[in-house]
UniProtKB/Swiss-Prot annotation:
Part of the 50S ribosomal subunit; part of the 5S rRNA/L5/L18/L25 subcomplex. Contacts the 5S rRNA and the P site tRNA. Forms a bridge to the 30S subunit in the 70S ribosome. The gene is rplE. The lineage of its organism: Bacteria, Pseudomonadati, Pseudomonadota, Alphaproteobacteria, Rickettsiales. It comes from Wolbachia pipientis subsp. Culex pipiens (strain wPip). The keyword Ribosomal protein applies. This is Large ribosomal subunit protein uL5. The keyword RNA-binding applies. One of its GO terms (biological process) is translation. It comes from the Bacteria. Belongs to the universal ribosomal protein uL5 family. This is one of the proteins that bind and probably mediate the attachment of the 5S RNA into the large ribosomal subunit, where it forms part of the central protuberance. In the 70S ribosome it contacts protein S13 of the 30S subunit (bridge B1b), connecting the 2 subunits; this bridge is implicated in subunit movement. Contacts the P site tRNA; the 5S rRNA and some of its associated proteins might help stabilize positioning of ribosome-bound tRNAs.
Length: 178
């Protein structure tokens, strides 16, 4: 649905709004990166299994494990220890995930009022976090041992934050300070 919405409506409206001479200049979604940090995995090797499976079911794609780049004694982490998992979504899986995120997961988040415009990075990319991964319907609440958060990065081909914001607004992203 999102991909069709983008092709049919959003490209035309953004082309008119920003006076692009070519359709290829219109900003588009490039990829969505989802990261789930698992601090417990540094001491317990089996602690990564459940978040790994949860992220796999949320994204619909197998995640990769992330490892510590250096040792930090304050966090009891050694270099090379597993500290989380991540997945990068592109094309159809990306659009499916964003649709589930906007219409199902975000409305189920506690105290969610929308995103701030300050979450753009200055180059047209948008990053935010979700406090509870149980907002997704794919997660069975009875089978999880701990509620975890997720970091989500949306990478666009937009040159500026203004263009990226218009793209995300057209995709029905909830911003509270327009």
């Amino acid at each position: 649905m999102f991909k069709q919405l983008y092709k049919d409506n959003i490209v035309k409206s953004l082309k008119d709004k920003f006076n692009y001479s070519n359709v290829m200049q219109v900003p588009k979604l490039v990829k969505v990166c989802i990261n789930m940090g698992v601090g417990d995995a540094a001491t317990d090797n089996k602690a990564i299994n459940e978040p790994f499976d949860n992220l796999h079911s949320i994204a619909g794609q197998k995640p990769v494990l992330t490892f510590a780049k250096k040792s930090i004694s304050g966090f009891k982490i050694r270099k090379g220890a597993t500290v989380g998992c991540k997945v990068t979504l592109r094309r159809n899986k990306m659009y499916e995930f964003l649709e589930r995120l906007i219409y199902i997961a975000l409305p189920r988040e506690k105290d969610f009022r929308g995103f701030s415009v300050k979450q753009f990075d200055g180059h047209g990319n948008f990053s935010f976090g979700i406090k509870e991964h149980i907002s997704f319907l794919e997660i069975d609440y009875d089978k999880i041992s701990k509620i975890r958060g997720m970091d989500i990065n949306i990478i666009t081909s937009a040159v500026s934050d203004k263009e990226a914001k218009e793209l995300l607004l057209a995709l029905k992203f909830p911003f509270f300070d327009n």
